[in-house]
C-alpha cells in the first residue's frame, strides 16, 4: 500500500485541524459554561525518531489516548507546567495552585481537559471523515519530553508524528497546548486519499 498523500488532499489535513479545534471549543464551552475558542496556529510533521529532541528535557503534563479504530495509533495532548496549572485552576473554579507537585484535584482536572481535547479533536476528524473513531481511556503523563517520547511512542510502530500547535482562549485563561497524533501511516493515508 502506498504511503503517499495526494498533494490535492493536503487541504483535508487543515480541515481535520479546523474541525477538531471547533469541536474541542464547543465541548469545553459546554462543560465549563465559559465561552471557549480554540485555534490551531501551526501544523508540522516530524519523524518519530526526532520526537525526544523536539519535546526537549523540560517537564510537561498531558494525556495520552490510544485510538481503537482507524487511523489507529494514539493522540497525545501536552501542556507546559504553567499552562497545565492554568487549566487545572480554571477547571477547579479559579482555585490557585500551591506549586510543587499536582494535587489529586489538579491531576483530575488536567486529565479531564486532556480527555475533552483529545475526544473533541478526534470527533472533529470523524465528522470530516464521515466515520466513528473510538478511543481508549486517557492516561495522565507528567515527565520530561524525552521520557514521554520514549515511553509513549514506539518508533518501530509509528513513523511520523503530526504536531498541532493549539491555543485555547477563555475570558480568564489563555492556554497553549500541543496535540501530537501518531497514526498508523497506511491507515491515515488511505483515509485521506479516499475522501
Curated annotation (Swiss-Prot):
Q: Tell me, which GO biological process terms does this entry list?
A: chemotaxis
Query: Is Hydrolase one of the keywords UniProt gives this record?
Result: yes
Fetch the InterPro entries from UniProt. Answer: CheC, CheC-like_sf, CheZ_family_phosphatases
One Pfam family of this chain? CheC
Q: What happens when the gene is disrupted?
A: Deletion causes a reduction in chemo- and phototactic ability. Mutant has a 88:12 distribution of forward and reverse swimming (distribution is 50:50 for the wild-type).
| Keyword 4Fe-4S tagged | no
Stated family = Belongs to the CheC family.
Write down what this protein is called: Putative CheY-P phosphatase CheC1
Q: Give me the gene this protein comes from.
A: cheC1
Amino acid at each position: 500500500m502506498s504511503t503517499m498523500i495526494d498533494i490535492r488532499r493536503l487541504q483535508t489535513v487543515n480541515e481535520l485541524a479546523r474541525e477538531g479545534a471547533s469541536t474541542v471549543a464547543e465541548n469545553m464551552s459546554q462543560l465549563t459554561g465559559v465561552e471557549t475558542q480554540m485555534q490551531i496556529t501551526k501544523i508540522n510533521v516530524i519523524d518519530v525518531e526526532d520526537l525526544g529532541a523536539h519535546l526537549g528535557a523540560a517537564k510537561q503534563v498531558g494525556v495520552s489516548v490510544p485510538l481503537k479504530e482507524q487511523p489507529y495509533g494514539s493522540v497525545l495532548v501536552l501542556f507546559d507546567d504553567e499552562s497545565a496549572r492554568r487549566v487545572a485552576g480554571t477547571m477547579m473554579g479559579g482555585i490557585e495552585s500551591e506549586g510543587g507537585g499536582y494535587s489529586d484535584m489538579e491531576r483530575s482536572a488536567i486529565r479531564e481537559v486532556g480527555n475533552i481535547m483529545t475526544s473533541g479533536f478526534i470527533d472533529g476528524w470523524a465528522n470530516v471523515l464521515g466515520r466513528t473513531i473510538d478511543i481508549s481511556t486517557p492516561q495522565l503523563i507528567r515527565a520530561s519530553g524525552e521520557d514521554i517520547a520514549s515511553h509513549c511512542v514506539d518508533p518501530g510502530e509509528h513513523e511520523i508524528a503530526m504536531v498541532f500547535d493549539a491555543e485555547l482562549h477563555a475570558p480568564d485563561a489563555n492556554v497553549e497546548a500541543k496535540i501530537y497524533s501518531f497514526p498508523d501511516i497506511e491507515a491515515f493515508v488511505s483515509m485521506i486519499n479516499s475522501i
